[in-house]
Amino acid sequence: MARFKPPLCGFSCAEISGKEAFAPMNDTFMKTKPVFPLLVSMALPNVISMLVNSLYNIVDSLFVAQINEQAMTALSLVFPIQNFVNAVAIGFGVGINALVALYRGAGDHDRADAAATHGMALSVLHGILCTLAATAIMPGFLARFTADGTIVSMGVTYSTIVFLFATVNMASLAFEKLFQAVGRMKLTMTALISGCVCNILLDPVLIFGLGPVPAMGIAGAALATGIGQAATLVIYLVVYSTTESPVHLRRKALRPDLSLEGRLYAIGVPAILNLALPSLLVTFLNGLLAAFSESYVVVLGIYYKLQTFLYLPASGIVQGMRPLIGYNYGAKEHARVAKLYQLTLGMSAVIMAAGTVICMAASAPLIGLFSSTPETIAIGQTALRIICLGFVVSAVSTTSSGALEGLGKGAASLVISLCRYVIFIMPLAWLLCHQLGPTGVWHAFWVTEVLSAVIAFAVYRKSVIKK
């Protein structure tokens, strides 16, 4: 049975980063290699690529902030919808990742190929739908949070261009999760870093202009983002087309398979909701904070930019754990599953402790990277020092949620995310905001993390340990 190969893009994979970056071809190392070096080898490329990616997001915001604070406010208001679109891409990719790893761990390679093929096709469909829906709702969505016509116009301009690349982003992230499922972390690191570097280099050129390239302002920032995503996808297409892969995209596997598609969505939908719930939360909190001052809205947007950077090392470890747990669970190596969970939890807690120290010691300089307004810096300094009190304990929730996704237990993972982003924090933020003012919103974050950690560990024990 011939596998489907996308057309070549004009250059060899060796020209991208070297042949060794695209090994290994045999994924049985996932159940034979010692746990600690295995997790580190799987997580480190993720950590590096995600740190570079988060750096790109911060650099992107730094360039936009140089336009004016209205542009930064527009980005903050667009963030929830942009995050939702990314959540659809990443969350459904988690479903692809988990099923491919589970089937390969169980030795069912044909089923793994079918899961990859259906996952890729559905990801492209999701991208088309997200482009149409997100572009249509943005003008009305932005107008709900600001009466400033300039901010609305900037937000519409930025989002329209970014969402035109949604299908590219969906396909790119589907390839990323597919390659991660078979342990090819160096490849995904290479592709992500290449896209990020492309974006960072294009940002100042397209935003402020250079030579014959006109200054495009916030539209240039959006276009740089889209081109960076396209560069990453091109690398995946070239590598898949020119090297042998443990998992194949097959035309014959595209025939309808409701059972397989149901399993993809059973894992993917909870993962999408896990990632999309922060968008719902940010929208809710923006509504509370906008009643006091737009500076609070800006601070919330800045915090989520910084949070991405602070959390991603731990998230990279969780991503490295996810296919390992799925593979070993499929191979019935339950002792290794438990060791992987415990090790990931400990490493994540250490990383988040470092993040807490950074936020406590350098809160004002961090906020000052994005705003020179004294009011915004003062508000942000207070916010960071309060919110970071919950960083260490949040490792329990993030590790448990990632482990459950890797095991294909998406509904249990969703329970944890609902606690973190809806059940606890929304009522707490509303109540504390009315009692303490906007500072109460910041306190709601750390209280929520403590409560959610208790629930997360209980859910993990019930779903995994006792079984």
Model-identified regions with their sequence ranges:
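Hydrophobic transmembrane alpha-helices of multi-pass small-molecule transporters
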Residues: 84-87, 131, 199-204, 233-237, ...
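Transmembrane helical elements of multi-pass membrane transporters/channels
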Residues: 41-60, 161, 195, 228-232, ...
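Short runs within selected transmembrane alpha-helices of multi-pass transporters and secretion channels
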Residues: 93, 97, 162-180, 188-196, ...
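Residue-level signal for short hydrophobic patches within transmembrane helices
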Residues: 32, 36-55, 59, 81-88, ...
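Helix-terminus/linker motif at the lipid-water interface of multi-pass membrane proteins
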Residues: 51, 55-73, 142-149, 205-216, ...
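Short alpha-helical transmembrane segments in multi-pass integral membrane proteins
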Residues: 2-43, 100-167, 213-269, 325-390, ...
